């Protein structure tokens, strides 16, 4: 507290605010020494630490960007592979459905042909039985007609 007033009293005694004596260059030299000491002891280590931290951040950020790019690339590749697999699965399903439809139609055609064959065989059998029955009936009619004729001729005689 007394120090500023003492300076003011000294300045008033000498006659001016600034006297050009050895104190100004001494203060300038002290200031330059302080700057040099602070520069070597504080600013350079802090600057090196900041620079190394910035380098670390830059390299980490570059690595992260590379990993992100790789992840995006792998995602696209996997999505492409998945879509190709889905297309292949759809093709396999379509082929299986077509094969099943073809097998079903072949079996249906075979069954229909077998049924048609059996129907034709049954129709032929019925036709043969009908012909046999008609022949037997004709024989019976002929026999009855012969008996009737004999009775008529026998009674007419």
Curated annotation (Swiss-Prot):
It comes from the Bacteria. Pfam families: ATP-synt_B (PF00430). One of its GO terms (cellular component) is proton-transporting ATP synthase complex. The chain crosses the membrane at residues 22-42. F-type ATPases have 2 components, F(1) - the catalytic core - and F(0) - the membrane proton channel. F(1) has five subunits: alpha(3), beta(3), gamma(1), delta(1), epsilon(1). F(0) has four main subunits: a(1), b(1), b'(1) and c(10-14). The alpha and beta chains form an alternating ring which encloses part of the gamma chain. F(1) is attached to F(0) by a central stalk formed by the gamma and epsilon chains, while a peripheral stalk is formed by the delta, b and b' chains. F(1)F(0) ATP synthase produces ATP from ADP in the presence of a proton or sodium gradient. F-type ATPases consist of two structural domains, F(1) containing the extramembraneous catalytic core and F(0) containing the membrane proton channel, linked together by a central stalk and a peripheral stalk. During catalysis, ATP synthesis in the catalytic domain of F(1) is coupled via a rotary mechanism of the central stalk subunits to proton translocation. Component of the F(0) channel, it forms part of the peripheral stalk, linking F(1) to F(0). The b'-subunit is a diverged and duplicated form of b found in plants and photosynthetic bacteria. This is ATP synthase subunit b'. It comes from Synechococcus sp. (strain JA-2-3B'a(2-13)) (Cyanobacteria bacterium Yellowstone B-Prime).
